[in-house]
UniProtKB/Swiss-Prot annotation:
PANTHER family: PROTEIN TRANSPORT PROTEIN SEC23 (PTHR11141:SF0). Belongs to the SEC23/SEC24 family. SEC23 subfamily. Component of the coat protein complex II (COPII) which promotes the formation of transport vesicles from the endoplasmic reticulum (ER). The coat has two main functions, the physical deformation of the endoplasmic reticulum membrane into vesicles and the selection of cargo molecules. It comes from Cryptococcus neoformans var. neoformans serotype D (strain JEC21 / ATCC MYA-565) (Filobasidiella neoformans). Pfam families: Gelsolin, Sec23_BS, Sec23_helical, Sec23_trunk, zf-Sec23_Sec24. It is found in: Cytoplasm; Cytoplasmic vesicle, COPII-coated vesicle membrane; Endoplasmic reticulum membrane; Golgi apparatus membrane. This is Protein transport protein SEC23. SUPFAM superfamilies: beta-sandwich domain of Sec23/24 (SSF81995), C-terminal, gelsolin-like domain of Sec23/24 (SSF82754), Helical domain of Sec23/24 (SSF81811), vWA-like (SSF53300), Zn-finger domain of Sec23/24 (SSF82919). The gene is SEC23. GO terms for molecular function: GTPase activator activity; zinc ion binding. Its main location: cytoplasm. CDD domains: Sec23-like, Sec23_C.
Length: 763
């Protein structure tokens, strides 16, 4: 079974691809039955289905017609495999229905299918820019240029608006062409949603928005002052952006600028929830520093007050942290309920408060990026890449989605880990065990990209001892309803089947997907760490690994030398070793904002990208061999090679000592050293390929052995050669570089694992 082929076809990877038949046996497999599903996975061979899906008439079922349904061609009926209800086909199916002429949704190759629904969205996508003006002139100039470029990438009918903030928050009127006009909110005041709606002149009544007739794109006349179609206001908005000035409020030498990020976001959320509830929209925040005033304040304006660190948070000695987090969480709930995504683009050397604001992006699946400045390529390319288009010219994003999961009676849903909120849908599919966001079978996802991946966890509920019919299968259906950027609603349906087997059957172990399992367990570990960042999470990971090895490894009791894992389990302990040392669980050397950013990206990434984050890839380039992957180990550092490290967040080219000396002596400029020039260029070309479709854009680092930036590589390597193991000071055996660390190496980690798994004494 090729797991990647299944992923290409259905966008799904399971931890186990044969399932234990009873609840007891399922708990003994340690890693829960779980799936990483990419709802908008790009597939070129999906047929355009321009009609409504056929749904089961069962009162609590509503499953959608799929290839696993039994079809009675003569009686024009189909049997739902989820609830066994007999359903008639709609009349328009009757004419052509035959065993040799089935509709696409019944063909085995279309276990994933996408319906284009007949009802279009009443309102086009909305993009509301929230722009920080408390930045230097050069920063503001670069930011304005990027924002003007972005307007040309939006759909012409998309609604667009602008809020700027510094000491005050200003909502700009786009319909007033004579001169710039804005509504001003005091940055130090905590406004209630009704106050904001009244001050903006929006109708606060809860009347549903009337359908839009062609030629009348403005559903709410009051809001049309602030949100207009790009094609109608591009000139006016470009003028406003180009004339934007730095916040005029004077800043004393020993103070930070007064920055009211909280008020600006509160106004943005209130504007959209009042005028466009339950509609596809994005609030895009461009933050050049931390909030220092008003609600959501992260740090005081006095420079002598440092911004909080992980150590401060652990000691519970942070003045603003809890209040700010609570404020942004309340905003995130209001935005996510209405389907509004919030993106945060940070352009600042210091922290901007991503830790406090993380709920805004985590609850709405917004974009989060970190860059040192708005002038950097990392910011510009990351932002403009989010507005990338497909071959038809539509934005590669879905809006205001709901994600439903159905299961057959043997399975129940434990929960989802990803950037979702619960839709509070109680159904017979909901299980007792809760992993992540549970107690529901549907979730709201405000924004989706073709790479957005959700982790869904299940439990087997069949009691032990209940007989199974031979080759009995369980079914799961993933249903994603979303607003396409073309203005249509679409429904993506994936139905998958897996076989049940008695506990202990060899096919269960053979079906283990160690890559998917590592990522699914990493998401649980990060979810636990978000609640309680303590060593308990590492202990839990270790316990799970030991139990998995005890269950599935071959060994003689109390004999560590006999320990052996089959190939489809053999790399799993290595993944866990690197996960324990990763920036997701080790906060040392990272700011709280960086930790929030790294965890945010992991919780939206597919298997391959997540694995690069957990266990980075390392390529070696030398004179005597073709470029080839090498161990992520200190023994891979040699003076005569170049290494290319990809950690997903960083792409690093590392020159060994000899290579660096030759490069500094400009040997590559001499004709006799053409092969050296080629060697220097090879990793640069490969790095460019990695940068091409990566989002967010990684930081690109070129360094030399012994240089300060070599720390990015050394921190990721397995320290098999340390200052304790080398015979000479600073050099390890076999030519590897000694790493100055007290961390245990993978070899020591594996020795301990073997001892604990086989039950031997560890003394």
């Amino acid at each position: 079974m090729n797991f990647e082929d299944i992923e290409d076809k259905d966008g799904v990877r399971f931890s186990w691809n044969v399932w234990p038949s009873s609840r007891l046996e399922a708990t003994r497999t340690v890693v829960p039955i779980s799936a990483l599903y990419t709802p908008l996975k790009e597939r070129e061979d999906l047929p355009p289905v321009m009609y409504e899906p056929v749904t089961c008439k069962g009162s609590s079922c509503k499953a959608i017609l799929n290839p696993y349904c039994q079809v009675d061609v003569r009686g024009k009926m189909w049997i739902c495999p989820f609830c066994l209800q007999r359903n008639p086909f709609p009349p328009h199916y009757h004419q052509d229905l035959s065993p040799n002429n089935l509709p696409p949704e019944l063909l085995p190759k279309f276990t994933t299918i996408e319906y284009t629904l007949s009802r279009p969205a009443q309102i086009p996508p909305i993009f509301l820019y929230v722009v920080d003006t408390c930045v230097d002139e050069d920063e503001l100039k670069a930011l304005k240029e990027t924002l003007v470029v972005s307007l040309s990438l939006l759909p012409p009918n998309a609604l667009v608006g602008l809020i700027t903030y510094g000491t005050m928050a200003m909502v700009h009127e786009l319909a007033y062409a004579d001169c710039p006009k804005a509504y001003v909110f005091r940055g130090s005041k905590d406004y209630q949603p009704k106050q904001i709606a009244d001050m903006l002149g929006l109708n606060p009544s809860n009347r549903p928005i009337q359908p839009v007739r062609p030629g009348q794109p403005m559903p709410a006349p009051a809001a049309s002052k602030f949100l207009m179609p790009v094609q109608a206001c591009e000139f006016q908005l470009t003028n406003i952006l180009e004339q934007l000035q730095r916040d005029p409020w004077p800043v004393e030498q020993d103070k930070r600028p007064l920055r009211c990020t909280g008020v600006a976001l509160s106004v943005a959320v209130s504007l959209l929830e009042t005028a466009f509830p339950n509609t596809g929209a994005r609030i895009m925040l461009f933050s050049g520093g931390p909030a220092t005033d008003g609600p959501g304040m992260v740090v005081g304006p006095e420079l002598r007050e440092p911004i909080r660190s992980h150590h401060d948070i652990d000691r519970d000695s942070v003045k603003h942290f809890k209040r700010a987090s609570k404020f942004y969480e309340a905003l995130s709930k209001r935005a996510s309920v209405n389907g509004h995504a919030i993106d945060i683009y940070a352009g600042c050397l210091d922290q901007v408060g991503l830790l406090e604001m993380k709920s805004l992006t985590n609850a709405t699946n917004g974009v989060m990026t970190i860059s040192d400045s708005f002038m950097t390529a990392i910011f510009k390319q990351s932002f403009l890449r989010t507005l990338g288009k497909d071959e038809q010219g539509y934005l590669k994003m879905g809006f205001n989605a709901t994600y439903d999961v159905l299961t057959t009676k043997e399975l129940k849903i434990s929960g989802v880990i990803g950037h979702v909120i619960s839709a509070n849908k109680k159904s017979s599919c909901v299980g007792e065990t809760e992993i992540g966001i549970g107690q529901t079978s549907a979730w709201k996802v405000c924004s989706l990209t073709p790479k957005s991946t959700l982790a869904t966890y299940f439990e087997v509920v069949t009691p032990a001892g209940q007989a199974l019919t031979p080759n009995q299968s369980g079914l799961i259906q993933f249903v994603t309803h979303y607003q396409h950027s073309s203005g249509q609603y679409r429904l993506r349906v994936t139905t998958v089947s897996r076989v049940f087997q008695e506990g202990g059957h060899p096919s269960i172990a053979a079906s283990f997907d160690q890559e998917a399992a590592a990522v699914l367990m990493a998401r649980i570990a990060v979810f636990k760490a978000e609640i309680d960042d303590s060593p308990d999470v590492l202990r839990w990971l270790d316990r799970m690994l030991i139990r998995l090895c005890q269950k599935f490894a071959d060994y003689r009791k109390e004999d560590p030398t006999s320990f052996q894992l089959s190939p489809n389990f053999s790399i799993y302990p290595q993944f866990m070793f690197h996960l324990r040392r990763s920036q997701f669980l080790q906060v040392f050397n990272n700011s709280p904002d960086e930790t929030a950013f790294y965890r945010h990206v992991l919780n939206d990434s597919d298997v391959n990208n997540s694995l690069i984050m957990i266990q980075p890839t390392l390529m070696s380039y030398g004179f005597d061999s073709e470029p080839h992957p090498v161990l992520l180990d200190s023994v891979s550092i040699r003076p005569d090679v170049i290494l290319l490290l990809d950690t997903f967040f960083h792409i690093l080219i590392f020159h060994g000592e000899t290579i660096a000396q030759w490069r500094k002596a400009n040997y590559q400029e001499q004709e006799d050293y053409a092969n050296f020039k080629e060697l220097l260029e090879a990793p640069i070309g490969d790095a460019q390929e990695l940068l091409e479709d990566r989002m967010p854009i990684p930081r690109y680092v070129v360094c030399d052995q012994g240089g300060s930036q070599a720390r990015f590589l050394l921190s990721k390597l397995n320290p098999s050669t340390t200052h304790m193991s080398g015979s000479n000071y600073g050099a390890g055996p076999a030519g590897g570089q000694a790493i100055f660390t007290d961390d245990v190496s993978l070899q020591v980690f594996m020795e301990h694992l073997k001892r604990l798994a086989v039950g031997a004494s560890t003394s």
